[in-house]
């Protein structure tokens, strides 16, 4: 039975629960070749294709936020670049109705200053392989963290991440459409906001969604807050979601920065940042793919956070 939550809990309470129950076993840094001094972080989960595993990662120099997404072939912890699409970041890959669906964020830069970001939007691509992806949908301006998932009846679930206008620093919305062709800006804007997922001083979003064997959705997301000095704190989190009723289980943190390998940060205010790409389930454990401090990426073995939702 789904244990429904009705009131958001702040990060400090979720961290207390995490420290009592955490199951983090090991972490390994992902190594990316042929990147000519660029960092690769905020990776997707691997997607199997033609007997090989591929991941997407955000690549940029340490001093810049102007980036591109690069696809890599993954062998163990070593990753070799294959081909870049024409988007900047926001890496997510999934299979929907037999097709690969890739979502990424395209940046708009200021024509007077190419290093200044003037806007962005999420774009979606589909294809039989990563080499023949073609655009099919785009989200609203200034919205990222949009994720698609195939539901048990074959329809497509859409998680959104509105900000402002009642959504504060960032909330999560949900809607569903019949087909990928129905994923439109209007459908995304019409998503119903899931209430009380985060407190008003905190924010979060959805990163990776799994269809569980009971029809619920296992959600890997992030929850975040800002402390003094504009220091950001990001934590991978999980919950189960009922797409029929919009009910969800209490959010739980599943990893934190101090429990992975030491690594450099892009800036001091990003030291305490783990940004999840998602998990690969493997029995009672799972591999969590995370970007670390906006500079590197790691694969962290944790206890499978979805097992309790399928019991």
Residue ranges of each PLM-predicted region?
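Conserved glycosyltransferase catalytic-site signature
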Residues: 202-203, 273
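Functionally critical, mid-to-C-terminal surface segments that flank or help form catalytic/ligand
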Residues: 207-208
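Beta-rich carbohydrate-recognition and catalytic domains
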Residues: 1-88, 94-144, 149-201, 211-269, ...
């Amino acid at each position: 039975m789904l244990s429904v939550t009705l009131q958001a809990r702040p990060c400090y309470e979720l961290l207390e629960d995490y420290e009592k129950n955490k199951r983090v076993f090991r972490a390994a840094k992902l190594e990316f070749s042929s990147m000519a001094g660029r960092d690769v972080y905020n990776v997707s989960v691997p997607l199997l294709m033609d007997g090989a595993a591929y991941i997407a990662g955000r690549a940029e120099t340490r001093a810049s936020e102007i980036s591109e997404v690069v696809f890599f072939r993954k062998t163990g912890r070593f990753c070799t670049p294959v081909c870049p699409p024409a988007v900047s970041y926001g890496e997510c890959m999934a299979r929907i109705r037999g097709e690969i669906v890739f979502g990424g964020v395209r940046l708009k830069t200021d024509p007077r200053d190419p290093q200044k970001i003037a806007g962005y939007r999420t774009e979606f691509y589909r294809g039989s392989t990563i080499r023949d992806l073609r655009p099919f949908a785009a989200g609203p301006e200034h919205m990222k963290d949009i994720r698609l998932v195939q539901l048990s009846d074959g329809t497509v679930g859409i998680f959104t991440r509105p900000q402002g206008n009642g959504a504060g620093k960032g909330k999560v919305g949900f809607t569903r459409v019949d087909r990928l062709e129905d994923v439109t800006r209007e459908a995304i804007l019409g998503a119903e906001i899931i209430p009380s997922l985060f407190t008003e001083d905190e924010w979060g979003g959805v990163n990776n969604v799994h269809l569980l064997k009971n029809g619920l959705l296992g959600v890997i997301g992030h929850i975040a807050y800002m402390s003094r000095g504009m220091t950001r704190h990001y934590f991978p989190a999980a919950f189960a979601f009922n797409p029929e009723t919009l009910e969800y289980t209490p959010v739980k943190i599943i990893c934190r920065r101090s429990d992975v390998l030491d690594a450099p940060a892009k800036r001091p205010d990003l030291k305490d940042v783990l940004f999840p790409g998602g998990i690969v389930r493997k029995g009672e454990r799972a591999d969590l793919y995370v970007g670390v401090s906006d500079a590197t990426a790691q694969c962290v073995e944790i206890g499978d956070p979805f097992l309790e939702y399928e019991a």
